[in-house]
Amino acid sequence: MKDTEKYLIHANIAADGVVERSDVVGAVFGQTEGLLGDELDLRDLQESSRVGRIDVAVESENGQSFGEVTVASSLDKVETAILAAALETIDRIGPCHASVEVTSIEDVRAAKRREVVERAKELVAGGFEETSLASDDILDEVREAARVEGIVDYEGLPAGPRVGDSDAVIVVEGRADVLTLLECGIKNAVAVEGTNVPDAVADLTADRTVTAFLDGDRGGELILRELAQVGDVDYVAFAPPGESVEDLDRNTVFEALRGKVPYSSLADEPNLREAATDDSGSAPIDNEGRGRSGEMSEPSESETESERASDGGDDGDAGVVAGGARSATDRGLVDAVEDTPAPAATDAGEVDEVGEDREGDMESDSDTADINDAEFDDRAADDPNLDEAADAESVEETDAPLDNEPRSIEEHVQEIVDAGSDRARLLGDDRGVLAEIDAVDAFDAIEDAETAPHTVVVDGLIDQRLLDVAAQRGVSELLGREVGEFVKRPVGTRVLTVGDLRTGS
């Protein structure tokens, strides 16, 4: 009946005496029987489930009984009203006089509608899940999924997708550090997952260029010492003191990696973190021509005089190169951090050849000078002013730098690029000329150079192929007329156009 009831008849009863529930039910059936005819007989209606169970609640007090009767009906509105009126004809309950008064006829469907409305209000207020995402939330969610999908399993350790085939790897502490580097575009990181360095990582360091990038705390130092004992470490970089790699932003990550130092210079230090921080401060090229190792070759007397003559120009050029190179590197996409140290030895045979060539040139120049001097003596007798002009000319010739003497980057750029020479020049740490070749042969020259150049100036396009071989040989700077599109851009090699150099952009 619960499923089909439409109305509920509520009636109050009062009896002059003590009565029970069974007395009330008997009075309802007995005194309404035959009153409304066969179609509305209460017993027949109940048997056909058109009228539900009669609920009675009665209490007795001071010799009188009071209560409430509830009858469920699935009849229509008119028939239900007739049935309710029939209940009021009851005047006796058991042996006692009684009265029945219908107080209300409740529409069950209306009650259900009220419940539906109230529940709907509750659902609207808090029943719905947040389905509308802001644009930033969507981007963050997709980026997070991309970062997680980028992690691969290398011998049971979390790693970037390039660890297996890259010739350089970055060793970090945990999975979160690998995620941070992936977010920065660095895909060749592998995690040791604790201070106990796994054998897989130790084996990996045997034939790769390894950079340990660790937290700036005691734990990072312990991992470095353990890694150095079981494997080979080439470079070391630490997060800022008290910070973890996983908490660093993109700029701080690249700043820390640029400041990496060779582990061989730290191996005997009692505090590796402080030593690494001190050494990284002198890593960039300064205005005096020092290399990345911070050492400076002893200049000859003639070189010293030449540098004094062009000190102002050199300082400005070095500052432009440093600032421009940093911004150019920041704009690039980093696929993997690869920085192979340059060989330090200089081939003696190459120096001898250069010396012989220069000696031959000097002899021919000397012969020409003797002839010119004889001609000049004849003219000088007629024109005394020629003496002063000759003195000035000799001063200019003395001040002009030799081809392999150190000079500013700007001078090399003017001689190679501005002159439209279609040539390339390989420069050493002191900006002296190591070799000069056709621009199309720059790749082979860098690859085959006995001494890896510090800087290469090219009158032409710097493409991915040239950048790759420069990074492999440890070239610090590449300067060209224009720069092509790069798929990956190693951190250790700065790439600038002549325009970038002069604008400082």
From Swiss-Prot:
One of its GO terms (cellular component) is exosome (RNase complex). This is DNA primase DnaG. Its EC number is 2.7.7.101. It catalyses: ssDNA + n NTP = ssDNA/pppN(pN)n-1 hybrid + (n-1) diphosphate. Residues 318-327 have a biased composition (Low complexity). Residues 268-410 are annotated as: Disordered. RNA polymerase that catalyzes the synthesis of short RNA molecules used as primers for DNA polymerase during DNA replication. Mg(2+) 1 binds at E173, D215. One of its GO terms (biological process) is DNA replication, synthesis of primer. The keyword Nucleotidyltransferase applies. Belongs to the archaeal DnaG primase family. SUPFAM superfamilies: DNA primase core. Residues 349-376, 384-402 have a biased composition (Acidic residues). Mg(2+) 2 binds at D215, D217. Keywords: DNA replication, DNA-directed RNA polymerase, Magnesium, Metal-binding, Nucleotidyltransferase, Primosome, Transcription, Transferase. Its cofactor is Mg(2+). The gene is dnaG. GO terms for molecular function: DNA-directed RNA polymerase activity; metal ion binding; poly(A) binding. Forms a ternary complex with MCM helicase and DNA.
